[in-house]
């Protein structure tokens, strides 16, 4: 799972950074132009619906604070997972770079291998680094696979899923509702496998997965798959003996990060909502956003570029003034996604200068 330095630096090529920007803005721009032509409204009237008021400024400022809350949650999570051996500033650098690599990779790929590499360069053993990354993946999976149904305790499930019934995806050849259940089912299967491999029967899962990967049909993925299987077993040794207080703290930090992430979108909606949003509206927006994040897992584009913006317009069109849903989607991504593409380069330059040449043979914490 550990990346090489050369592979890491390749991620910072101009092409890798520009690709998600071009894809996202290109798809949205084309769709936005089509909707504008279809509506027949003068461009001036459409732009007037984005009138900035004191209310808009307040909510957008709050959205920026929610992004800070999100990053703080992940920094706190990383501090807990490393037994507070990493400084806050180091945690911030790792989180920002982790987000950068997630932004330039398809959602299903993410930046796990790069995250392990960065932690190893911070003098954390490969075993502990692997355990940390698998723990974050596990907690994220638990959070956003369960949230749509937790939200349905407060908001009718029919209201949460209503827009998906009428959206057809040419990529899937069917409704987005089917796409959601396919993505959710795959994530649940993956989550169950993680629980079994990390906590319930790590040696049994290791044995079966190793033999499965020996089949001829998996020969192209065998080498990488065997590394992953061994990484899971290593991580399980580190995690199974953790006390309840550890899991409570790391879950609170994870929840804080995801709540901050979700409330960014709520703030963007509230900034330009035709009428003030009620508590029910905010809960409904959270429920639909949980659906959106799962649908985004299907995206083959870097950082779900294009898919995230279109999904926003499909799911939240009834929250926004007519004709401006895609514009709000772009604003949402300008706050929550594109900054990481910009921040990544200077942060990486600083990080490489600080850690390059570190002796990883003397780990600061962790297991071998």
Where do the language-model regions lie?
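Membrane-embedded helical hairpins/re-entrant loop segments and their flanking transmembrane helices
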Residues: 72-97, 269-288
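Hydrophobic/aromatic residues in alpha-helical transmembrane segments
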Residues: 73-78, 115, 261-268, 291, ...
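Juxtamembrane inter-helical linkers in multi-pass membrane proteins
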Residues: 94-100, 206-232
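Alpha-helical transmembrane segments and their immediate interhelical loop/hinge regions
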Residues: 223-273
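Transmembrane helix-loop-helix hairpins in multi-pass inner-membrane proteins
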Residues: 1-44, 101-216, 301, 305-368
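Membrane-interface helix starts
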Residues: 13-19, 52-62, 237-251
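Helix-boundary and loop/linker segments of multi-pass membrane transporters
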Residues: 47-55, 84-87, 235-243, 278-279
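Alpha-helical transmembrane segments of multi-pass membrane proteins
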Residues: 89-100, 128, 282-294, 323-331
């Amino acid at each position: 799972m550990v990346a090489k330095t050369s592979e890491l630096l390749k991620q910072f090529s101009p092409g890798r950074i520009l690709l998600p920007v071009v894809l996202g803005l290109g798809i949205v721009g084309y769709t936005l132009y089509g909707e504008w032509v279809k509506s027949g409204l003068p461009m001036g009237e459409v732009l007037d619906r984005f009138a900035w008021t004191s209310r808009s400024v307040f909510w957008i400022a709050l959205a920026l604070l929610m992004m800070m809350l999100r990053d703080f949650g992940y920094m706190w999570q990383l501090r807990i997972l490393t037994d507070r051996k990493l400084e806050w500033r180091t945690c911030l650098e790792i989180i920002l770079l982790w987000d950068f690599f997630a932004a330039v990779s398809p959602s299903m790929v993410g930046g796990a291998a790069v995250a392990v590499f960065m932690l190893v360069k911070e003098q954390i053993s490969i075993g502990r680094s692997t355990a940390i990354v698998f723990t974050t993946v596990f907690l994220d999976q638990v959070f956003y696979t369960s949230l749509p149904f937790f939200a349905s305790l407060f908001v009718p499930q029919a209201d949460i899923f209503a827009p998906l019934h009428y959206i057809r995806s040419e990529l899937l050849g069917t409704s987005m509702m089917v796409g959601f259940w396919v993505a959710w089912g795959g994530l649940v299967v993956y989550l169950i496998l993680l629980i079994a491999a990390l906590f319930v029967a790590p040696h049994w899962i290791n044995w079966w997965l190793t033999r499965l990967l020996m089949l001829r049909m998996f020969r192209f993925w065998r080498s990488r798959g065997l590394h992953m299987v061994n990484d899971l077993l290593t991580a399980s040794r580190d995690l199974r003996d953790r006390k309840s207080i550890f899991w409570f703290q790391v879950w609170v930090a994870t929840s804080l990060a995801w709540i901050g992430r979700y409330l960014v979108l709520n703030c963007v909606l509230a900034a330009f909502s035709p009428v003030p949003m009620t508590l029910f509206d905010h809960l409904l927006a959270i429920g639909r956003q949980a659906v959106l994040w799962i649908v985004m897992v299907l995206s083959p584009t870097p950082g779900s570029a294009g898919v995230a913006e279109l999904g926003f317009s499909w799911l939240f069109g009834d929250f926004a003034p007519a004709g401006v849903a895609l514009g709000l989607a772009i604003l949402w991504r300008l706050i929550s996604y594109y900054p990481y593409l910009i921040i990544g380069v200077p942060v990486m330059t600083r990080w490489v200068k600080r850690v390059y040449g570190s002796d990883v043979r003397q780990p600061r914490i962790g297991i071998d």
